[in-house]
């Protein structure tokens, strides 16, 4: 299915479970739409000329797949996104505040599920997002807003973390190997259980004025 839509309000069940390829959605309103199991491949959701993205607020994105799509400036606020896959996408400036990636089993028990990989998340907003034990590798995190976010136990390996505020988020027990760690200062960040590779450790030690021999 290939489409070119502009400024359309998407009906709740229009794309549920469908596969949509190489389509263009400019200024489209997916708010409240049920996109459970929907696959978007090679689709454009960003209008470069007007620098505006699409609205996915309050959408149901359970097990939805976005592959090689442009999701720049998309509004995902308060969407239900358990099991979402965003792979090989552009998502600069996307807003994930209030997006739920979790399944609440009881008030004290939950698990998260999300696969956001090889994606440009520069200047995206993940404030207060809970993405624990998720696949978040090989992403670009330049200037990403993460105040109050928790990534505990997630795979953040191979990432680019320039202009990233490490003190703002919980990265305990994360895999950070093969990542460019930018301005990470170990004196102000809880790194309990974090995985680092030997090259990263040597750079961190150098910053602290410690010389590693051998």
From Swiss-Prot:
The keyword Repeat applies. Residues 23-103, 116-189 form the Pentapeptide repeat domain. The keyword tRNA processing does not apply. Keywords: Antibiotic resistance, Repeat. SUPFAM superfamilies: Pentapeptide repeat-like. It comes from the Bacteria. InterPro entries: 5peptide_repeat (IPR001646), Pentapeptide-BTB/POZ_domain (IPR051082). GO terms for biological process: response to antibiotic. Confers reduced sensitivity to the fluoroquinolone antibiotic ciprofloxacin (five-fold increase in minimum inhibitory concentration) when expressed in E.coli. Belongs to the pentapeptide repeat protein family. This is Quinolone resistance pentapeptide repeat protein QnrB96.
């Amino acid at each position: 299915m290939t489409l070119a839509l502009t400024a359309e309000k998407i009906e709740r069940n229009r794309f549920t479970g469908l596969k949509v390829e190489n389509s263009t959605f400019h200024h489209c309103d997916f708010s409240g739409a049920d996109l459970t199991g929907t696959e978007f491949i090679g689709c454009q959701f960003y209008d470069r000329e007007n620098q505006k993205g699409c609205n996915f607020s309050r959408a149901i994105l359970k097990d939805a797949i976005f592959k090689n799509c442009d999701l720049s400036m998309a509004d995902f606020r308060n969407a239900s996104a358990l099991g979402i896959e965003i792979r090989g996408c552009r998502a600069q400036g996307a807003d994930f505040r209030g997006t739920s990636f979790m399944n609440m089993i009881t008030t004290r028990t939950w698990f998260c599920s999300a696969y956001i990989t090889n994606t440009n998340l520069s200047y995206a907003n993940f404030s207060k997002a809970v993405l624990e034990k998720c696949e978040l590798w090989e992403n670009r995190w330049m200037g990403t807003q993460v105040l109050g976010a928790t990534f505990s136990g997630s795979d953040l390996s191979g990432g680019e973390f320039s202009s990233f505020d490490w003190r703002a988020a919980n990265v305990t027990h994360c895999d950070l190997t093969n990542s460019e760690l930018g301005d990470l200062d170990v004196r102000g960040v809880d790194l309990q259980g974090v995985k680092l590779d030997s090259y990263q450790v040597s750079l961190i030690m150098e910053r602290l004025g410690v010389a590693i021999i051998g």
